[in-house]
Amino acid sequence: MAKAKKKGATLFKVVSTEGTGFFYLVCRNLKNKQEKYSFRKYDPVVRKHVLFKEAKLNK
């Protein structure tokens, strides 16, 4: 089943800094966190954990 739409929550794309083009989609509440997301996650293209940074989601 699909997730329920949260009020005030927005969908964002976090892109690998390795330049592979791999990305994750993240839903976050803008009222709680104003700063941009950046965290380490697994990039299957380079097969290691790398830093991912927030980017705009093109609709």
Swiss-Prot record:
Native species: Neorickettsia sennetsu (strain ATCC VR-367 / Miyayama) (Ehrlichia sennetsu)
Key words, A-Z: Ribonucleoprotein, Ribosomal protein
Highest rank taxon of the organism: Bacteria
Pfam family, one: Ribosomal_L33
SUPFAM superfamilies assigned to the protein according to its UniProt record, in alphabetical order: Zn-binding ribosomal proteins (SSF57829)
Record-given protein name: Large ribosomal subunit protein bL33
Cellular component terms per the entry's GO annotation: cytoplasm; large ribosomal subunit
GO biological process, one term: translation
The keyword Ribonucleoprotein belongs to this UniProt entry's keyword annotation: yes
UniProt record similarity statement: Belongs to the bacterial ribosomal protein bL33 family.
Keyword Cell membrane: no
GO molecular function ontology, one term from the record: structural constituent of ribosome
PANTHER family linked: 54S RIBOSOMAL PROTEIN L39, MITOCHONDRIAL (PTHR15238), LARGE RIBOSOMAL SUBUNIT PROTEIN BL33M (PTHR15238:SF1)
